[in-house]
């Protein structure tokens, strides 16, 4: 059973994102003293009174202006209201009742979702009730004075939220696979998210930097739960000013860190850029499973040779991710989009896979039979005694040798290729740790390992 949803609604700069961070005990929602920082619907999990629910933060509602993203923000707010059990409408107690608040109240009365009214920025308990009193005029029920920044009154508000949540399902839901959708600005990440979800979950625009938050979306595919993380486009550092986009990019890197698998989106028309390479390196550095999705394939003139030729060219530049599957799609038409999920499942399975020591050493012995370790000019030869898997996520192996410095980069890459050829791990990075050991100790430890 999906978690119930609580929507946060209000005009710009009343403290909605600060309240989200307070309710969810996080800093995932971007807070910045500038209207319009939040644009898409962003989701986080909240917990109160033994209940877990999803809090959806929405952009600031403005009804007398249709410039930039404001119509799309209103659409996102409507979608949030449609899926919510209850909406928390936030107003600014210090600024007082405004015409914008009255316009939002009129819009809310057309919605079917029940409403609770929170009067934010009431840091003084003595003045809070007086500040909240004028908001009775909105006709949205009792205005509750709160302070999102200090937490005052938020507990009482959450107690009321619990009354609107459906009965709790006692059966525990399995952990979803977390998939981060990452890439440069304007490669089609939000279009891909919308195609996958079958709705406008994210605002799509040709303007770079439209997505600023990391947008969490929960869906199910063939019995598997997924949490999709659509991230802000990552540009060159000197192109980014301090502000909402700066914070959004930091959220993107955090999304990579907390993901199980990354979908790196490449623009088929533009090919691989320096920023794509840096992003690929970041994914590999974090040790995340990955697949490369080449979007806008519908815009490329092609014949039967175009795809293999382009894949070869792209892989030559994305050498960090030579192990990642590559898929050519069109987020606009939906071409091959559904293939992303089985490839992602396979990558996650390989990322979590463990292999017995006996099987690891069969592969290593075959590698040694095909190509002996290098010998120095002085006649010293590297000796690889045995190996064992020491970790998963990503799969990591310790190889015991006489002297690690005798094994150069070329031979180390050869051993990794042989491990992949013999054991698989498609879609997952592999870590090899070369550790020096005396021959006698290595033989004793190998015998013990073989018995396990």
From Swiss-Prot:
GTP 2 binds at residues 183-190, 230-234, 295-298. Gene3D superfamilies: 3.30.300.20, P-loop containing nucleotide triphosphate hydrolases. The keyword Repeat applies. GTP 1 binds at residues 10-17, 57-61, 120-123. It comes from the Bacteria. The keyword Membrane does not apply. Residues 4-169, 177-352 form the EngA-type G domain. PROSITE patterns: G_ENGA (PS51712). Keywords: GTP-binding, Nucleotide-binding, Repeat, Ribosome biogenesis. Residues 353-438 form the KH-like domain. InterPro entries: G_ENGA, GTP-bd, GTPase_Der, KH_dom-like, KH_dom-like_a/b, P-loop_NTPase, Small_GTP-bd. Signal peptide: none annotated. One of its GO terms (biological process) is ribosome biogenesis. One of its GO terms (molecular function) is ribosome binding. Associates with the 50S ribosomal subunit. Belongs to the TRAFAC class TrmE-Era-EngA-EngB-Septin-like GTPase superfamily. EngA (Der) GTPase family. GTPase that plays an essential role in the late steps of ribosome biogenesis. NCBIfam families: GTPase_EngA, small_GTP. This is GTPase Der. It comes from Synechococcus sp. (strain RCC307). The lineage of its organism: Bacteria, Bacillati, Cyanobacteriota, Cyanophyceae, Synechococcales. The gene is der.
